[in-house]
Amino acid sequence: MNLERVSNEEKLNLCRKYYLGGFAFLPFLWLVNIFWFFREAFIVPAYTEQSQIKGYVWRSAVGFFLWVIVLSTWITIFQIYRPRWGALGDYLSFTIPLGTP
């Protein structure tokens, strides 16, 4: 979709949908929202809906980076401590590596 051919109200509506969709445990939508609407929010000349789009883009960026931090922390903890958790670590694993930890 070419955003230049879409009305400003439709841009705002689409940006809002991507922002709200990110709350359904889909942080990739926030990343798409950031890349797709960054130009509309911060570079193009000002228009009425731009301030709302800017807010959605900023909040999408914050949400996405919080997801990255939480997911990176969980992956690091799981990789380091999984063998110590015994049966629980094995239960949470999709594949169980061979050998000793």
Swiss-Prot record:
Membrane topology: Multi-pass membrane protein
Subcellular location: Endoplasmic reticulum membrane; Golgi apparatus, Golgi stack membrane; Cell membrane; Membrane
Gene Ontology CC annotations of this record: endoplasmic reticulum membrane; gamma-secretase complex; Golgi cisterna membrane; membrane
UniProt main location, coarse: endoplasmic reticulum
Intramembrane stretch boundaries: 18-36
Signal peptide: none
Keywords for the protein's UniProt record, in alphabetical order: Cell membrane, Endoplasmic reticulum, Golgi apparatus, Membrane, Notch signaling pathway, Transmembrane, Transmembrane helix
Any one of the GO BP annotations: Notch signaling pathway
Record-linked InterPro entries: Gamma_Secretase_Asp_P_PEN2
Stretches of the chain found on the membrane's Cytoplasmic side: 1-17, 37-57
Parts of the chain on the Lumenal side: 79-101
TM regions (residue ranges): 58-78
Functional summary from the UniProt entry: Essential subunit of the gamma-secretase complex, an endoprotease complex that catalyzes the intramembrane cleavage of integral membrane proteins such as Notch receptors and APP (amyloid-beta precursor protein). The gamma-secretase complex plays a role in Notch and Wnt signaling cascades and regulation of downstream processes via its role in processing key regulatory proteins, and by regulating cytosolic CTNNB1 levels. PSENEN modulates both endoproteolysis of presenilin and gamma-secretase activity.
Entry's family note: Belongs to the PEN-2 family.
Assembly behavior: The functional gamma-secretase complex is composed of at least four polypeptides: a presenilin homodimer (PSEN1 or PSEN2), nicastrin (NCSTN), APH1 (APH1A or APH1B) and PSENEN.
Official protein name in the record: Gamma-secretase subunit PEN-2
Organism annotation: Bos taurus (Bovine)
Native organism taxonomy: Eukaryota, Metazoa, Chordata, Craniata, Vertebrata
Originating gene: PSENEN
